[in-house]
């Protein structure tokens, strides 16, 4: 590449950077048939979301997002952790209302089932406004919020739940009762409520029946030794259970962490940082190796103003030549388009090349790195080359 081309490319990158869509947070109020009040929701989209129309995003659901710092920290960390700089997420914050008629606890606690003497067994949760609507929140998620995200955003189909304290308990309860999410991050959860109900449910859950890859993270700060004996016992039981690999299938990744130098709220920062680091490792290793047993038809097109020379596609399975850079040769449709029809296991990870790794495609409408097809729809995927420098390593003079 000559000096003139390099200068032109740098100027073009500056121009693109100036015009690219920035990260954004949308505030939404949703009516729900399960609540008498509107549900406030925050939706974060990463930079370039509008431009990268062939990138589909995993969705992180963050509970207790009425504490805005919890929500903001999640999407900040997804950009700052350097393990996979091209892995970005949609982040959805679920805000609990704060009013004299509805407490935050009501979102996350089920009605006690072990209550003989209501006042003594419910303790500080004795007020009826302070518990009992967790089943309604699950219905809101499953039947209203998640379908809204699927309809209005490009989602990959993989969902992660993150909670702290009572909302962490709720996230784990979503797993044992509904398999609501694919992956779970529970920071400082309450395992002792209602006579250790959550821990007992975790013990009974049929872990070995779950065949898909799953990430589970749970942690505790100084509460593990400084809070009341019931809380300490709940954590001791749960952490011992989660630490025993014999309870889980091989493709379930479980992490148990302690942060004894941090109290309940300050512990959210170091714990979430550790959780996101571990999750990105899981995402870029385990998830990429797990393929569906079935194959699905996919029509893939690559477009450019002047499509000259041979083009190959290669990726993470036999139908994509198992990352051989001179993999599957694409068909030349016309001067601006080449295409290929394949039967692929999902998720499919792939790249376009000129036949070697020194000449890879610069894709304009997808995030850099591996291109990914997660879902069976749409069956046609159209990628566009950057017209100025469509291929790395080629002189465009």
Language model regions located:
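Aromatic-rich carbohydrate-binding modules that target alpha-glucans
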Residues: 303-347, 355-375
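Hydrophobic h-region of N-terminal signal peptides that target proteins for export
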Residues: 10-19
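Compositionally biased low-complexity segments at domain edges in trafficked proteins
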Residues: 306, 378-397
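Non-catalytic cap/lid and distal C-terminal segments of serine-dependent acyl enzymes
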Residues: 21-293, 309, 314-319, 333-338, ...
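Beta-strand-rich binding-surface signature
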Residues: 22, 297, 327
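A short, amphipathic beta-strand motif
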Residues: 296-304
């Amino acid at each position: 590449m000559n000096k003139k081309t390099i200068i032109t490319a740098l100027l073009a990158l500056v121009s693109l950077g100036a015009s690219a869509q920035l990260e954004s947070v949308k505030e939404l109020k949703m009516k729900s048939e399960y609540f008498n009040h509107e549900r406030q929701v925050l939706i974060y989209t990463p930079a370039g979301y509008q431009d990268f129309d062939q990138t589909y995003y995993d969705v992180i659901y963050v509970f207790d997002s009425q504490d805005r710092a919890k929500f903001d920290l999640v999407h900040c960390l997804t950009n700052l952790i350097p393990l996979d700089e091209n892995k970005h997420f949609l982040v959805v914050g679920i805000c609990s209302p704060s009013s004299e008629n509805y407490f935050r606890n009501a979102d996350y606690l089920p009605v006690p089932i072990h209550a003989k003497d209501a006042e003594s067994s419910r303790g500080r949760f004795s007020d009826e406004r302070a518990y009992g609507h967790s089943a309604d929140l699950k219905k809101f998620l499953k039947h209203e919020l998640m379908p809204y995200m699927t309809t209005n955003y490009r989602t990959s189909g993989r969902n992660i739940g993150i909670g702290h304290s009572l909302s962490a308990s709720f996230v784990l309860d979503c797993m044992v009762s509904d398999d609501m999410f694919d992956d779970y991050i529970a920071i400082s959860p309450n395992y002792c409520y209602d006579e250790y109900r959550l821990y007992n449910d975790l013990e009974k859950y049929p872990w070995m029946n779950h065949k898909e890859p799953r990430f589970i993270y749970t942690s505790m700060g100084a509460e593990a030794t400084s809070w009341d004996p019931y809380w300490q016992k709940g954590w001791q039981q749960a952490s011992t259970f989660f630490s025993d690999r014999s309870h889980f299938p091989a493709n379930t990744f479980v992490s148990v962490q302690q942060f004894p130098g941090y109290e309940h709220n300050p512990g959210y920062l170091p714990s979430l940082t550790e959780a996101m680091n571990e999750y990105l490792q899981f995402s870029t290793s385990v998830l990429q190796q797990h393929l569906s047993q079935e194959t699905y038809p996919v029509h893939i097109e690559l477009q450019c103003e002047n499509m000259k020379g041979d083009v190959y596609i290669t990726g993470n399975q036999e139908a994509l030549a198992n990352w051989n850079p001179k993999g599957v040769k694409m068909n030349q449709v016309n001067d601006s388009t080449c295409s290929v029809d394949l039967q692929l296991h999902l998720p499919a990870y792939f790249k376009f090349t000129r036949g070697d790794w020194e000449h890879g495609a610069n894709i304009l409408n997808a995030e850099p790195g591996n291109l990914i097809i997660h879902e069976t729809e749409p069956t046609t995927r159209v990628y566009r080359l950057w017209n100025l420098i469509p291929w790395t390593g080629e002189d465009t003079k």
